[in-house]
Amino acid sequence: MTETGTTESGGTPRARLARRYLEVNGEHPMTEADDAYVDRQFAPLEPLCARHGRDPDEVRGHMLDGRLPLPGYLRSDGTEMVAPDLLELVDEAGGLAKLPDWFRGHWADREEGEEEYESYLSGQNVCLHRLHPVTMRRKAELVRGITEALDRPADGPSGRLPELPALHAMVDELDALEPQFTAYDRLRFGGPVSRDTCIDAVRRDHPLD
């Protein structure tokens, strides 16, 4: 570390984290509407660290080293936006060292648990109001259930899907778990998000009435 707070590997922790974020998410502009959405759903990293008595650069270092998730978003002014309960999850796990095994242990299938943990660390899991292994697992179950229901043959000439009330119950539960997403998400993910395909499209194309 130099006297200016930079490192020989390429600038301040904040600058290096911004570069890593863009490597993962690509370079897509954040509009005023995107910023406003993110302000409602996420928390700026530095004030969050202050509330928890954490050093922001230390937290950034953990993100860069793959011990904590990357920010979910960078606002247009460069502010790192993270899940409001980012550090609470670490406390629930019993500390940063215990987080990986605690997190993976929520899945019976070890490989699936590892995949979900890597997804968590990417910072791209912005699809839940509360980012937690329990809600991640439930979302995956609901998306699978909805997809399977949509793949079933329709009932006769009516064109209605079988067990439509059960399908809508899953859609309603998923709706409660997920935020609205923003236009930026559809750019970085390259198309529709799960809210588009598993909530809005189902309600539009397969209404109960």
Enumerate the predicted regions with their spans:
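Polyanion-binding surface elements
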Residues: 37-59
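DNA major-groove recognition helix of helix-turn-helix
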Residues: 63
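The DNA-recognition helices of helix-turn-helix-type DNA-binding domains
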Residues: 66-67
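Long, charge-rich, low-complexity intrinsically disordered regions
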Residues: 5-24, 30, 71-209
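Short, amphipathic alpha-helical "recognition" segments used to contact nucleic acids or chromatin
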Residues: 28-40
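Acidic, glycine/polar-enriched metal-coordinating patches/loops
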Residues: 1
